[in-house]
Amino acid sequence: YLVVFRGTDETIVGWKEDFNMSHQTQVPAQDAAREYLTKVMTEFDGQYIIAGHSKGANLAIYAASQLDKKLQDQVSAIYAYDGPGYQRDFLETEGYLAIESKIHAFQPEDAVVSQILFHTVQAKVVACKGISMMQHLLENWEIDKVSFKERDSVTPGSQRLQATLGQWVDQHSAQELEAFFGAIFGIIEATGIETLNEIGDNFLMFLISLQREIRDTEDSDLLKEGFAQLQAIYKEQGDETNANFLEVVQGKIDSATSFIKNLVPDALLPGKSEDKQVEEGGDPQAKSEETDHGTI
């Protein structure tokens, strides 16, 4: 059997949960993945391959680590494609260590997502088209007949990003990380934006609203201090060339916006599916359910 977990959708809520992984021992999607995988493997006896892309890769590994020994023995392999990592404590748990040797990890040469938090399995580096977050799209991964075209290592920029984020996370407690990311997403949510697509479609208005919320928030000093620390660490990781961390972040945001626009069909954007159904004579009340659960 093959169980595959999907990644994050375009909602701000979904991305907020991704960053919550930096300070929460378990996020709701991980718990749902654990429950789903346990249920499926209990119902259908046999050997399993578990896989996932992006956040789905994180869920695949996490869910497998939470299985009891009998079910873990039925997992033949786990394939993780450009997924964010874990807190260091998780990587030392008995459940994770039991399935560590079964993990096959892959990341693009200019990786961003898989450079967040920590891993113990060395990922194979895949040659890709595009740069930055556009390489997160699997359609941009290069294939040679039946296998990925590989590179020796990720780009220097990707290495620097990983070193910066890793050192910054190590320097802060769970409470400090929760406060920082809570402030960031609190500001974004205060602008009324609910999806990354809305940011891309109304970027100028979003920036104006964001500046206003940052100016008015009680967490302004907290955010300034956090970004100043990131900037200082980033400079320590290399020379002064392209040493502005905020400019790098802006580039990642621009790339992420393009990434989301390529990832999500118009029919799945808020309001678009109903318009299309009405045009085609369909039922505008019909809704589809999307979850982080896998499929078998």
Where does each model-flagged region fall?
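Alpha/beta hydrolase fold serine-hydrolase catalytic domain that processes acyl esters and thioesters
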Residues: 1, 5-47, 68-296
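Gly/Ala-rich beta-loop-alpha elbow adjacent to hydrolase catalytic centers
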Residues: 52-56, 60
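Short glycine-enriched nucleophile-adjacent loop
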Residues: 60-69
